[in-house]
């Protein structure tokens, strides 16, 4: 995702975004884009602090103002704090992009307080809200493409903490949603969805 953001910043001069005090972990900093501040309104990296709700409200406001394409980011387990404003994004048909990271049981020593369980179901249940949980870098790039080309629908990119190996066949149908990555002959022993 971080590589995609840095490719997009060169093609989208109106791209601006940031994280709730987790940019190095979320990989959401745009290199050589400066930090938005009182001294530098041209900076494109926003530092929201530990304020997920305010971050999302600010992202909505920037999108409502027009002219900017905005993304916000935090750990997926903290997405609960973004929910009221994320719902307003959907209701207002505001195509804000959410980058939620660390969706994995491999999140490390922080234990269950940092393990998102119900958040994916919550966002998937929200009307007019796209949710992508890409399996690799190819699907992540496709999810970003869908997010930045959306005109009326907010998008959540739900990403793992770990680097993931490319999946064979993940490219062709990545924008379709669910699809078969690896089929078998005969009756399968297991179907993994």
Model-flagged regions — what are they?
Residues 1-158, 163-165, 174:
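Thiamine diphosphate
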Residues 151-153, 173-193:
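Long hydrophobic segments that form regular secondary structure
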